[in-house]
Amino acid sequence: MDVQLPIEAKDIQKLIPHRYPFLQLDRITAFEPMKTLTAIKNVTINEPQFQGHFPDLPVMPGVLIIEAMAQACGTLAILSEGGRKENEFFFFAGIDEARFKRQVIPGDQLVFEVELLTSRRGIGKFNAVAKVDGQVAVEAVIMCAKRVV
């Protein structure tokens, strides 16, 4: 599969099954097969989670940042295998060493940098970092498992 960068949201949807309001990636900006992927998400006040988290102090929920990091990891795995195959999914399988270093608010641009650490029998282990303005907001080790359904 020839990967042309950047990969925009409409084409990300051809790679991963997530859709609004759960698709958390806006663009893939860098990719090295079986190694690294960089993606971005523009955080806007129009996103549904900000109606309740929190109305007077909107803060991006940490679990959604982790989900976005997992989507980036799954996208790295799928692109590394040449694209999405029918009935094949990469599921979020685990998380270790998660640390939340700064709040993410509407107007921020999240930059996700994910690196494949190991891949064995359909399970990938990734180092994932989410940054805002070059500062680490969230970091974690994420596992994704491939499954045919």
From Swiss-Prot:
Q: Which UniProt keywords apply?
A: Cytoplasm, Lipid A biosynthesis, Lipid biosynthesis, Lipid metabolism, Lyase
Give the record's GO CC terms. Answer: cytoplasm; membrane
**Enzyme class, one word?**
lyase
Q: Which GO terms describe its biological process?
A: fatty acid biosynthetic process; lipid A biosynthetic process
What job does the chain carry out?
A: Involved in unsaturated fatty acids biosynthesis. Catalyzes the dehydration of short chain beta-hydroxyacyl-ACPs and long chain saturated and unsaturated beta-hydroxyacyl-ACPs.
Q: What's the gene?
A: fabZ
Subcellular localization, per the record? Cytoplasm
| Organism of origin | Neisseria gonorrhoeae (strain ATCC 700825 / FA 1090)
Similarity comment: family membership: Belongs to the thioester dehydratase family. FabZ subfamily.
Q: Which Gene3D superfamilies match?
A: Hotdog Thioesterase
Q: Which reaction does it catalyse?
A: a (3R)-hydroxyacyl-[ACP] = a (2E)-enoyl-[ACP] + H2O
Q: What Gene Ontology molecular-function terms does this entry list?
A: (3R)-hydroxyacyl-[acyl-carrier-protein] dehydratase activity
Q: Where is the active site?
A: 53
InterPro entries found in the cross-reference section: FabA_FabZ (IPR013114), FabZ (IPR010084), HotDog_dom_sf (IPR029069)
Q: What is its EC number?
A: 4.2.1.59
Protein name in UniProt: 3-hydroxyacyl-[acyl-carrier-protein] dehydratase FabZ
